[in-house]
Amino acid sequence: MPELPEVEVVRRGLHAHVVGKTIGAVRVHHPRAVRRHEAGPADLTARLLGARITGTDRRGKYLWLLLDGCDTALVVHLGMSGQMLLGAVPRAEHVRISALLDDGTVLSFADQRTFGGWMLADLLEVDGSILPRPVAHLARDPLDPRFDAAAVVKVLRRKHSEIKRQLLDQQVVSGIGNIYADEALWRAKVHGARIAATMTGRQLTAVLDAAAEVMRDALAQGGTSFDSLYVNVNGESGYFDRSLDAYGREGESCRRCGAVMRREKFMNRSSFYCPKCQPRPRL
């Protein structure tokens, strides 16, 4: 699933190319792609017709397009395999929605697995930020200029569950998924099974700092692409997968100490870690 860096790459691409454009005809090719828009496909297409895009924003793994003259936004969730693509004509297989812009560009939403989608949502003011209603419950993410690491540390010190589980909780800190949780924990030399409440404030701060650092590094390299499912708006893959220190490296040498990297099951996922740098906590 695209995580914060991948979604931010897409948002930046959209911001550069669609802000100031007016939406013309919109076609929903697969109704599942707008299933979260409760009023249905016809309502979404009618309300988007003639709307001018005035900006883009993001929180965690959600991005949205701001529309002129209304207090609603077009919210996009990429799900497992969603792609926002720009081109003269719909250019991808699995195109679920397409929108013609006034300069002739087609904005396409492609989604092989159909877990993502578009919806229109009301904008609300939450803690000094203007957010779409479906996003309002999400915590700030580590790349948010107003992210308060000290406040998050206070929350984590009350959590009697694994630190990795807390990193994946979008109401504690948003935008972090399995890949970047493993990468942050490796950089901070912390095993994901450590109970958050047993960690010091300094240790928890180090984990949050590592999460921000690794996501900035990934963003600089266009995100992480293991296959063709994640691409930017031009259909290009990111290349941070070549720089991963933990995720997917079972059986390889730790880049820091040389120990053999391990994998273990965690929440129907896999966790990758170094047994020497990140010793498992004692029960």
From Swiss-Prot:
SUPFAM superfamilies: Glucocorticoid receptor-like (DNA-binding domain) (SSF57716), N-terminal domain of MutM-like DNA repair proteins (SSF81624), S13-like H2TH domain (SSF46946). It comes from the Bacteria. InterPro entries: DNA_glyclase/AP_lyase_DNA-bd, DNA_glyclase_Znf_dom_DNA_BS, Formamido-pyr_DNA_Glyclase, FPG_cat, MutM-like_N-ter, Ribosomal_uS13-like_H2TH, Znf_DNA_glyclase/AP_lyase, Znf_FPG/IleRS. Its EC number is 3.2.2.23, 4.2.99.18. Involved in base excision repair of DNA damaged by oxidation or by mutagenic agents. Acts as a DNA glycosylase that recognizes and removes damaged bases. Has a preference for oxidized purines, such as 7,8-dihydro-8-oxoguanine (8-oxoG). Has AP (apurinic/apyrimidinic) lyase activity and introduces nicks in the DNA strand. Cleaves the DNA backbone by beta-delta elimination to generate a single-strand break at the site of the removed base with both 3'- and 5'-phosphates. Monomer. Belongs to the FPG family. This is Formamidopyrimidine-DNA glycosylase. The lineage of its organism: Bacteria, Bacillati, Actinomycetota, Actinomycetes, Mycobacteriales.
